[in-house]
Amino acid sequence: MTRLGKPTGPRPGFSREDVVEAALALGVADFTLTAVAERLGVAVSGLYRTISSREDLLIACLERIAARMSLSRTGVTWQEVIRAHAMSLWALLERYPGLAGVIMSVPWAHQLFAAPLAQAHQDLIDRGLDGEDAGVLLDFVGDTVIATHAQVEVMRSPITRSRTLSSPGATDDAVPGGHRADLTGLEEARRFATTAGESPMPAVLSPDDSWIGRGGLDRKIEIIIRGVEASR
């Protein structure tokens, strides 16, 4: 909710940039105004001298992240350009955990990346794709990279056992001291896979270490590229 009226009183001892960096340090998906204020050592009300709302701060965070997206423009072919774009986007998602989820869940979030997307779109056109194909390719690859990273984040993170005890074969294991032994998402997926019985997943789709690496991203991108090549 936007705060109405002009803030009064002395100028704050911190800048809007300081507030943005504090929010990013807490996590673009997780920050709260209370946590940001605590990190800066000020009252929440003091933040409203530099921002108008949490949404305003999220916009500023996404603008900062987009400005830090490094696009390689050295590719000779459109195939090289789209591979480089996918890797640049992946690197950005690695740098800012939770960003994939924000882009997927906040309807306008992707619009803050208009500048790098426009540049990538033009680079594809300059290397032989028409505008529509270039746009669809960027959208397809972007969706693939973002969705893959979101799932990889789940597989890397601890899963609270109480959320999964209803699944087949689940037990309320505990470690010394009475605390539940949380598993990572990958470990939980592997545990679940052992209970599949007569309906196991195909080996190529079964949990493995790639699920906490790049999630088969490179192969997915190559399949997309081959599809575009075949349609031309």
Model-predicted segments: where are they?
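Short, amphipathic alpha-helix enriched in basic
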Residues: 6-35, 39, 63
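Short, basic, alpha-helical segments at the C-terminal edge of helix-turn-helix-like DNA-binding modules
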Residues: 64-69
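Hydrophobic alpha-helical connector segments
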Residues: 70-115, 131-134, 138-141
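C-terminal peripheral helix-coil segments that are non-catalytic and often amphipathic
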Residues: 1-2, 154-232
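Amphipathic alpha-helical packing segments from all-alpha helical-bundle domains
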Residues: 104-140, 182-199, 215
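HTH DNA-binding helix-turn interface
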Residues: 27-28, 41-42, 48-58, 98
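A contiguous pocket-lining binding segment that forms or flanks enzyme active sites
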Residues: 118-179
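Amphipathic alpha-helical interaction segments
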Residues: 18, 56, 84, 115, ...
